[in-house]
Amino acid sequence: MAFTFAAFCYMLTLVLCAALIFFVIWQIIAFDELRTDFKNPIDQSNPTRARERILNIERICNLLRRLVVPEYSIHGLFCLMFMCAGEWVTLGLNIPLLLYHLWRFFHRPADGSEVMYDPVSVMNADILNYCQKESWCKLGFYLLSFFYYLYSMVYALVSF
């Protein structure tokens, strides 16, 4: 049993991947709450509840915005660690999502907003559906990656 830099990378990635899974689960719950808020016709006809709805939507979008940079940074750290460790297959599996994160970050709205998840645009049904599908896809990717990292960590520890 040998402790190598690759084994360390897989251990750290395993812990951080669990954090990313929780981030994405929180995003799915937040988008579901926005969808419920969007479709509730009783609250839309109540003017006293309208201000509360708007504040709730702004609060959720603000929290979603705060998770974007940490998620992208953690995934970028994965790629950097695997590149330094010479784990080319694992790096190759992570590059497509890294490129998507870079594309999504640099193609944010041109109105000068911080990143994305603007309350007005997120309440558009098409954008809300897109964001929710994106979160489900990321959850699948991170879950599969978690088990791949677990297997690779064990393999790296017992292979020498």
Swiss-Prot record:
Q: What membrane topology does the annotation report for this chain?
A: Multi-pass membrane protein
Q: Which UniProt keywords apply?
A: Membrane, Transmembrane, Transmembrane helix
- Report the SS bond pairs: none
The listed locations are: Membrane
**Which loops or segments lie on the Cytoplasmic side of the membrane, by the record?**
1-10, 94-138
List, in alphabetical order, the GO biological process terms annotated in this UniProt record: synaptic transmission, glutamatergic; vesicle-mediated transport
Q: Name one GO cellular component term.
A: membrane
Q: Which InterPro entries does the record match to this protein?
A: Cornichon, Cornichon_conserved
Q: Which Pfam families would you find in this protein's record?
A: Cornichon
Membrane-side (Lumenal) residue stretches: 32-72, 160
Q: Name one molecular function that GO assigns to this entry.
A: signaling receptor binding
Q: Which residues cross the membrane?
A: 11-31, 73-93, 139-159
Per the record, the similarity remark reads: Belongs to the cornichon family.
Q: Which PANTHER family match?
A: CORNICHON-RELATED
Name of this chain's protein: Protein cornichon homolog 2
Q: Which organism is it from?
A: Danio rerio
What does the organism's lineage look like at the top? Eukaryota, Metazoa, Chordata, Craniata, Vertebrata
